[in-house]
């Protein structure tokens, strides 16, 4: 099992210079960076090419995992060269559609008993403000 904290300067990964050219600006670019890493990884450990590749992540990886999987699937040259087979993708608690996901926080918290009816309107107000701010960028 290989754990990769990616993209650079997210989580515990640190490139050093946060203004470096290695900084990514999109999920697709992160997918390209990860494919480049995997290419070098398989050159170092060619025996692992025989193992099925599962890509997993949680939370904001809901943006990056699909991009990485798409990068692999669309790059038929890389697949043919490495002979690596993408066997599966899993995303836990993915942050894939923030505006729509925000819409259900109040209901989720209320139905789980985390927020009482007394505070539900307050949570709904903060939820609405969160959506407004999210859409503003």
Name each model feature, range by range.
Residues 2, 6-19, 24, 31, ...:
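Accessory cap/linker subdomain of secreted extracellular hydrolases
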Residues 5-7, 59-62:
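Catalytic nucleophile-elbow at a beta strand-turn-alpha helix junction centered on a G-D-S/GDSL motif
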Residues 23-35, 60-66:
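Phosphate/oxyanion-binding active-site loops and adjacent basic polyanion-contact surfaces
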Residues 32-51:
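Conserved acidic catalytic loop of the alpha/beta-hydrolase fold
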Residues 42, 55, 62-79, 89:
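Short glycine-enriched nucleophile-adjacent loop
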Residues 44-50, 76-80, 137:
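Surface-exposed helix-capping loop/turn segments at secondary-structure junctions
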Residues 46-60, 85:
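Alpha/beta-hydrolase fold nucleophile elbow
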């Amino acid at each position: 099992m290989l754990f990769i904290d990616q993209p650079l300067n997210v989580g515990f990964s640190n490139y050093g210079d946060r203004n470096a050219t290695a900084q990514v600006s999109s999920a697709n670019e992160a997918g390209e960076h990860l494919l480049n890493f995997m290419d070098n990884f398989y050159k170092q450990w060619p025996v692992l090419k025989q193992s099925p590749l599962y890509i997993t992540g949680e939370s904001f990886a809901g943006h990056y995992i699909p991009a990485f999987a798409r990068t692999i699937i669309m790059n038929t040259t890389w697949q043919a060269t490495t002979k690596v087979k993408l066997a599966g993708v899993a995303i836990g608690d993915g942050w894939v559609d923030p505006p729509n996901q925000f819409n259900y926080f109040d209901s989720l918290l209320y139905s789980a008993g985390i927020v009482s009816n007394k505070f539900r309107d307050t949570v709904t107000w903060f939820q609405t403000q969160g959506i407004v701010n999210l859409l503003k960028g």
